[in-house]
Amino acid sequence: MITGIINLKKEAGMTSHDAVFKLRKILHTKKIGHGGTLDPDVVGVLPIAVGKATRVIEYMTESGKIYEGEITLGYATSTEDSSGEVISRTPLTQSDLSEDVVDHAMKSFTGPITQVPPMYSAVKVNGKKLYEYARSGEEVERPKRQITISEFRRTSPLYFEKGICRFSFYVSCSKGTYVRTLAVDLGIKLGYASHMSFLKRTSSAGLSITQSLTLEEINEKYKQEDFSFLLPIEYGVLDLPKVNLTEEDKVEISYGRRILLENEADTLAAFYENRVIAILEKRGNEFKPHKVLL
């Protein structure tokens, strides 16, 4: 069975699950998962784990993400992105808003902030996904979540036309951030209805869009028995603290035994001869093998 990490460039119009389903058909294997869901309209980096690498995919979802996109001020939608129905309008012209005001407002969102996930999201409340409530017209109290915005800035001039204002942006954020909600909250701060009109994820789990491949490109490589699209499993633990093991430690780990290590981390990626062989978890003064990858 093939094993590794794929830096997939997801295209618009497909869910993250659709991408996994198509890769299973291309690679003729069922053991495939994704790290970090992308909405159907969002394009960009979707980390994929194949084979044994699926055992470390949970650690890929912990990392921060980088996005580039577009915010439109002037009207809001039911889904907070361009796919929803228009629910309110606040027309504006060039005399109503300056770039300095926008930049100042964007800067106020950096650091730890509280965010309420959108109704059209997969967050569960009482065992039911929020979008299921939304589709049936029900409004429920949504759990607040703590996120961190490392950087949020404008990357284009403000473009005004027919009562709306559009501009491009860059955001670096923690896992669990809803960028479309960030776009809506920015609009509220500026005093206008708004939504996220485009979004592209350019980096996730240490994978960059500059090296990502489309499904079509992966399919062509696989047909030619070119497996260069598969990155080593070690790419799945880039964000974990690492420790190099002795041969004696490796043997103990292979039997599922605990080992003594001087390390303050709660979770470690254990390496032997430059290969990740286990995920270790702290238990008192010892580390227990949580996942053995030998």
From Swiss-Prot:
* EC number per UniProt: 5.4.99.25
Q: Can you tell me which residues form the catalytic site?
A: D39 (nucleophile)
Q: Name one GO biological process term.
A: mRNA pseudouridine synthesis
Q: What does this protein do?
A: Responsible for synthesis of pseudouridine from uracil-55 in the psi GC loop of transfer RNAs.
Name of the protein in question: tRNA pseudouridine synthase B
- For this UniProt entry, which residues form the secretion signal? none
List the GO molecular function terms: RNA binding; tRNA pseudouridine(55) synthase activity
Q: What class of enzyme is it?
A: isomerase
Give a single Pfam family match: TruB_N
Any idea which UniProt keywords this protein has? Isomerase, tRNA processing
Enumerate the catalysed reactions: uridine(55) in tRNA = pseudouridine(55) in tRNA
Protein family (similarity comment): Belongs to the pseudouridine synthase TruB family. Type 1 subfamily.
